[in-house]
Amino acid sequence: MIHFRKHHTNLLHSFIPDFIPYLKALFHNRVYMLFICITVLQFSAFNGIMTFMPKYLEQQFGKSASDAIFSIGIYNLPVVCIGYFFGGLFMKKFKTNTFQAANIAFWISLSGYLLYFSTYWTICDASPVAGLTVSYEGREHVSYTENTLLAGCNNDCNCALKIWDPVCGDNGVTYVSPCLAGCKASTGTGKHMVFENCTCIAASGFSSQNVSAILGQCDKEENCDKMLHYYLILSLVCSFIFSLSATPGYMVLIRSLKPEEKSLGVGIHGLASRVFAGIPSPIYFGALIDTTCLKWGTKSCGGEGACRMYDIVTYRWLYLGLPALLRGVSYIPSVFILLILKKKLKSSESKVLMNPPVEMQTKEEENESLK
């Protein structure tokens, strides 16, 4: 036991003097540190998108959670694997230098980034919700408080304002609950329940001869399924391009390190990407998305539950805009890496021209002796 402790202490004492110089060398490696900045920014954007994509598909296109997750698995995950494979195959075949690899990664990634902006046009408007997105008279408004859920048509009903039990009126408007729709009677049971004599539907500014409502939110626009397919196809292409650029980018990381620094450098790179991107990005993405919530649910114990209704326009701009901002900033250190590598390449080429290889010098001497 004593021998083991001495051996362990000796290893520790021999490790620390070697570790500090390597760590110092890594922190003074400009390409390596810039690459870590790029990774943190790009991975933060990617992690935020993938974490909240199921929720985005639910809110924007009206898909269920299971359908949203299934769609992501079908459209996004396979092409990421294919992109990594072809990226590695491409780099193996063409045997590029570090500057060429960085150039390829930059332009491929930039093309995917520009294509990403086309997702802003895959829009699906939600059905109006009385007291949240429109007034009970049918006028649009953006400000929301619990008082806006009350109107003259339901003021005398003593409705609970924190309950989320939506019903769809015959006028195409969703109401937070049958009580807030002013419904006086119901027929049927379970999913087939129909609420009748709904005073708020009758008093709304929408033309409707009926004053009944059914369980659930009203359906979204007819073009929502088409827009969903457009969004998923664009997401598929962007995911493929993103993964295609990853392999040449990783080659830049590896080649920027000396052989004795690679194991430590790769480890610190992985640690930084998880500590500064993998952990915090879902937190601040979630906090920002929560600011777009219009109606919070209530737990059985009375506490605040999950968000039931979002302002989908603000949600869309935050969900798509924040990754665009992070990725856009990541191209600043990318440009600096290209400039540094280009300068190194020119410097090495000038040295070769000034000091030709030994074989070339020997051949020139032989040619001189033959003359």
Language-model-derived ranges and their functions:
Residues M1-R30, T39, F52-P54, E58-Q60, ...:
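Disordered extramembrane loops and terminal tails of multipass alpha-helical membrane proteins
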Residues A272-S273:
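Conserved, compact domain cores that house catalytic/ligand-binding motifs in diverse enzymes
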Residues M33:
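An acidic-aromatic substrate-binding cleft motif
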Residues I36:
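Active-site-proximal flexible loops/turns
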